[in-house]
UniProtKB/Swiss-Prot annotation:
It is found in: Cytoplasm. Coiled coil: none annotated. Homodimer. NCBIfam families: leuA_bact, PRK00915.1-1, PRK00915.1-3. Pathway: Amino-acid biosynthesis; L-leucine biosynthesis; L-leucine from 3-methyl-2-oxobutanoate: step 1/4. Pfam families: HCS_D2, HMGL-like, LeuA_dimer. It catalyses: 3-methyl-2-oxobutanoate + acetyl-CoA + H2O = (2S)-2-isopropylmalate + CoA + H(+). Residues 392-523 are annotated as: Regulatory domain. This is 2-isopropylmalate synthase.
Amino acid sequence: MSQQVIIFDTTLRDGEQALQASLSVKEKLQIALALERMGVDVMEVGFPVSSPGDFESVQTIARQVKNSRVCALARCVEKDIDVAAESLKVAEAFRIHTFIATSPMHIATKLRSTLDEVIERAVYMVKRARNYTDDVEFSCEDAGRTPIADLARVVEAAINAGATTINIPDTVGYTLPFEFSNIISGLYERVPNIDKAVISVHTHDDLGMAVGNALAAVQAGARQVEGTLNGIGERAGNCALEEVIMAIKLRQNLMNVHTRINHQEIWRTSQTVSQICNMPIPANKAVVGSGAFAHSSGIHQDGVLKNRENYEIMTPESIGLNQVQLNLTSRSGRAAVKHRMEEMGYHENDYNLDDLYDAFLKLADKKGQVFDYDLEALAFINKQQEEPEHFRLEYFSVQSGSNAMATASVKLACGEEIKAEAANGNGPVDAVYQAINRITDYDIELVKYQLGAKGHGKNALGQVDIVVSYNGRHFHGVGLTTDIVESSARAMINVLNNIWRAGEVEKELQRKAQNKEHNQETV
């Protein structure tokens, strides 16, 4: 009988560590809801003790996600576990994930401890976590470089202490599939109480082995796989969950396991993560890359035309990537747009129909026909703009030429006030940015400017993603229109609003902290 492999997504924890700019609470929630819709069993959404912002993100997601188990990370430290529990207590169901290093190198040089002390601390912290929940995961950091006898001792002790999931990470992506398989099978041979816990694996891609190691571990008995969408993560990244999921689906006859993932949501969830995290998907990326179903060889094209299965082991439709349709114009009504969004898998709470339809009409007037990928892009921008905006672009104009310095005039709404400025620059985008900087007077540094296209040919939308540095923090902004200069301006306005909102959040957190201190003093 086929057994279930639990899918544990850590895009919002391990994956976010690779980003140049931290995600906002709203952005994290948007990804979490997409993961829930895709059907992940467990989502690790943050490290609450690390910052007030991370605590708020975990708490917000824990409150709103209903169909996936929400998990938070904690070191084997009392405060970490207590704070994680506090952030998660509003969830329908939650898990605390605690970890400590077990390899000789980490124990000696990082922890400056001994294996016996590590086991003692792991046992104590697992028991502490069990005071808050009966779902506790324990990870042996750097398990891939831990002698199997030592690893077995730690695992047995953690299970006896109450851990219900034991995670075996290849933290530095060092092992090869046959080695990793031997580690898992070795634990099954050496740990007498191993049947009392789910064995999980968490693999990294430093040698390009993350997916191979995960699948080898499943064959050896692991029943939970941890990873991220699109494989994002520190260094070379994490195990790409979409690849593991589709490998299990397509080779189920060989592996005799299954997942509960809604495969039709894979492509859209992948795109959501890519857009929000500002991490483009390589064209040759397995499963979700733009070239995954493209055939350029004449022999291959001929074979596909005769029978798709000649060269396609899966269909675009199997991951929710349907054919582009050209059925929407400026004459299409609100109901038609709503119906098309529903056909693409969107729900009413995924976007504001009034705002989306207004944006659709403006785009349709410019382009004539609106494609599915246009609607996807508009829905993404629509979601980003749901948060309150302090800055709003009212108007801009640019003059430039091959032998003339670019000049830009910009008018912004700044709260209740309208301000305008003009500036010169090294090109139209720089001129617009100089004018915006004069109005807002934020001391920011542009760290990254990235221009991409949404769609195909001359009717593609221009997407601009930027990252700026402000007060030691990085902030991300995105703009999407048919005009790349306007997209650039809107990306900068998006960044400025993100900076402003971050400041408002900090003020609110300070106010709450002061009120808490005041209440304690008066007790």
